[in-house]
Amino acid sequence: ACGTSVPQRWFEAMKKLDFIVASDLFMTPTIMGLADVFVPVATFPEHDGIVQPHFGRCTHFLGAMNKAVEYGETKSDLEICFDLGKRITPEAWPWDSVTEFYSWMLEDFVGFDFDELRARDAYQAPYQYRKYEKGLCRADGKPGFETVTGLVELKSLQFGAWGDDPLPYYIEPQYSPYSTPDTYKEYPLVLTTGGRKFTSFHSEHRQIDSLRRIDPWPVVEIHPETAAKYGIEDGGWVEIENQFGHCREKAHVTPTVDPRVIHAQHGWWFPEQDGEAPNYYGVFKAQINNLMPHEHIGKLGLGAPYKCLLCKIRPVMGLDD
């Protein structure tokens, strides 16, 4: 529901694959629309595991997850990978169990096995300060940082080697009031997206009733002057459109956005709606990525115009009307 620009294009491309297996905690539009087989995964109380809260091997803290309950035949993500790996390339999976794999990983990382982590409840690695002075930041063991020069680089020599400007620079968006004034006449508002709400993480948690009661609908923030200009009322449905696509969200009239800008939420779908084709939980109805073009990216292939496009808006009766 939020992974890419031009989502319908990717949806049609994925349908051409011969076979798709999906695993998740809940049914989703992707599963309903694409998966040949759905494997429900175990929730965190249903499997053993290791908590690494700070990006894997960069963590300073580890905790043990101890399986508390077992329901049906669900397996964790790692157990599914483990079972597949043992069958497809057994030489790459020499461990006899997932917990043995955890012990192997821990022995290399902190020097003790999974059973000891369970006994400890949690482990915090000792801190080392000024690692750059001791050669602990670089793969070659030399003092400094893991950059070409070993220094904190305000000028990135690596970017220069890749053919980009080694210094920060600004490029006007491909579609903006300044770069495309003719397009701006037809689509006179700047569209920005991607703001977060604490009730969800991208498309996650839309199916949790208590969180949906807090944020029941997708919202587009509009300045009062802009709302008055286009006849839009607070709480009313709005269609957002540009040359690439359209979607619908509910208006939140607020002075916190610039009158020239609207801010639309992303990652919406409606688990209460029909999940079968062609609806797929209504994932394309409030899909702000419908308005995002493909391949409008930076020189090195990064970025997309999720924060800076042009659009127009109009009041509508509802999500489907």
Where are these regions (language model features)?
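Short, glycine-/Ser/Thr-/acidic-enriched flexible segments
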Residues: 1-2, 26-28, 43-46, 67-69, ...
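Glycine-rich phosphate-binding loop of nucleotide-binding enzymes
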Residues: 1-37
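Short acidic, glycine/serine/threonine-rich loops at helix termini
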Residues: 5-7, 31-35, 49-53, 203, ...
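Short, solvent-exposed amphipathic alpha-helical segments in soluble enzyme
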Residues: 8-15, 37-38, 181, 206-210, ...
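Short His-Asn-centered micro-motif
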Residues: 22-24, 41, 222
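Flexible glycine/proline-rich, aromatic-decorated loop/lid segments
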Residues: 26-64
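Long, contiguous, secondary-structure-rich segments that constitute the structural scaffold
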Residues: 68-71, 75-122, 208-221, 225-321
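Long, low-complexity segments enriched in small/aliphatic residues
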Residues: 102-208
